[in-house]
Amino acid sequence: MAFVKAERLKLLPPYLFQEIDRLKAELTAKGVDVINLGVGDPDLPTPDHIIARLKTAAEDPSTHQYPSYSGMNDFKVSVAGWYKRRFGVELDPLSEVLTLIGSKEGLAHFPLAVINPGDLALVPTPAYPVYHVATMFAGGESYFMPLVRENGFLPDLDSIPADVARRAKVMFINYPNNPTGATAERDFFEKVIAFAREYDVIVCHDAAYTEMAFGGYRPLSFLELPGAGEVGVEFHSLSKTYNMTGWRLGFAVGNADILAGLGQVKSNIDSGAFNAVQWAGITALEGDQGCVVEMQRIYKERLDILIEGLKRIGLHPEVPRATFYVWCPTPPGYSSKDFSSLLLREAGIVATPGSGFGAPGEGYIRMALTVDKERVREAVERMRKLSF
């Protein structure tokens, strides 16, 4: 019997990062020394004290049973405490914190809780592909909000037509931003809250990169702004902050009613995060944060090497204050795919074409600071030898 994919799958382009992995594996199999700047997966190890807590927790048989659907109360209390210390935001751990199997899982399930077939979501572009795909899976439609250099890679809310705004059910935002590295300040979040109130729109803020910042910059939580908790929720992850991408642990916080809806979806789809991983997460959030400071130092060192090198060879990268991404315009005459293909074929460097994140990403590539500083230097040297 021939397998026929569901129509929704036929609408999907190849998943961007899966395609990058495929190309990398193909070149590696041919003996090419590949420098992978394509995927935002930290190369740094999870800190030792977090690993040690996982070991002891995993040896406790009580952690081997099904976890709570909404997360261990101890973990949610820890999240609330971290939000209070880091952002000054008060949260009720029992109703305003929901444990996730990584923030991607929560973001992917979120539209199922808030979007009906035919509803409209306001989705930034270029952006993490999950926002649009999850909306489509829920039967919704995306209205794309361009993120362009001239507006600081922030969506221009004033340009959204009134009839679109009235139809919109949810707005996705993400700051510090993937892929552009842009950041948002209080005035932008205030506009978002006012827009949400005027048009009765739910705000979904992906805040996975707030702890990956440089030079003393402290990114805001959306929930620091008055009224934010009335209109939206914020998604966070331990993946980037503590180098725990493979552990799959995150959380959503904010409006209790919205989180209850997401929790209802999750309880019918998954069985929660492994309790031993949640205990390790508590150690991460409550333990010495020196590991976060060290992570920031390492990425800043790599960032400086890459930015200086790109400028030296005639490119004009955006200089981020946060995230571990560099958003760099392509040389004149090159499309995003053309330039990323040149880097791959001629230099063995994997960089992500900006167009893969959405049409306004055309003319850019994204490079991730996820190799050590010597490999960053090597990547710059290989690029210097190219003709473009």
UniProtKB/Swiss-Prot annotation:
Modified residues (N6-(pyridoxal phosphate)lysine): 240
This protein's name: LL-diaminopimelate aminotransferase
Species, as recorded: Syntrophobacter fumaroxidans (strain DSM 10017 / MPOB)
One Gene Ontology molecular-function label: pyridoxal phosphate binding
CDD domains documented for this protein: AAT_like
Binding of pyridoxal 5'-phosphate, residues: 69, 103-104, 128, 178, 209, 237-239, 248
Subunit (UniProt): Homodimer.
Stated role: Involved in the synthesis of meso-diaminopimelate (m-DAP or DL-DAP), required for both lysine and peptidoglycan biosynthesis. Catalyzes the direct conversion of tetrahydrodipicolinate to LL-diaminopimelate. Can also use m-DAP instead of LL-DAP as the amino-group donor.
The protein's annotated pathway: Amino-acid biosynthesis; L-lysine biosynthesis via DAP pathway; LL-2,6-diaminopimelate from (S)-tetrahydrodipicolinate (aminotransferase route): step 1/1
InterPro entries the record matches: Aminotransferase_I/II_large (IPR004839), DAP-NH2Trfase_DapL_Desulfo (IPR019881), DapL/ALD1 (IPR019942), LL-DAP_aminotransferase (IPR050881), NHTrfase_class1_PyrdxlP-BS (IPR004838), PyrdxlP-dep_Trfase (IPR015424), PyrdxlP-dep_Trfase_major (IPR015421), PyrdxlP-dep_Trfase_small (IPR015422)
Keywords for this protein: Aminotransferase, Pyridoxal phosphate, Transferase
A Pfam family per the record: Aminotran_1_2
Family: Belongs to the class-I pyridoxal-phosphate-dependent aminotransferase family. LL-diaminopimelate aminotransferase subfamily.
Reaction(s) catalysed (UniProt annotation): (2S,6S)-2,6-diaminopimelate + 2-oxoglutarate = (S)-2,3,4,5-tetrahydrodipicolinate + L-glutamate + H2O + H(+)
Source species, domain of life: Bacteria
Coiled coil: none
Cofactor(s) recorded in Swiss-Prot or TrEMBL: pyridoxal 5'-phosphate
PANTHER family for the chain: AMINO ACID AMINOTRANSFERASE, L-GLUTAMINE--4-(METHYLSULFANYL)-2-OXOBUTANOATE AMINOTRANSFERASE
Biological process (GO), any one: lysine biosynthetic process via diaminopimelate
Enzyme class: transferase
EC code(s) of this entry: 2.6.1.83
Entry binding sites for substrate: 15, 40, 104, 128, 178, 366
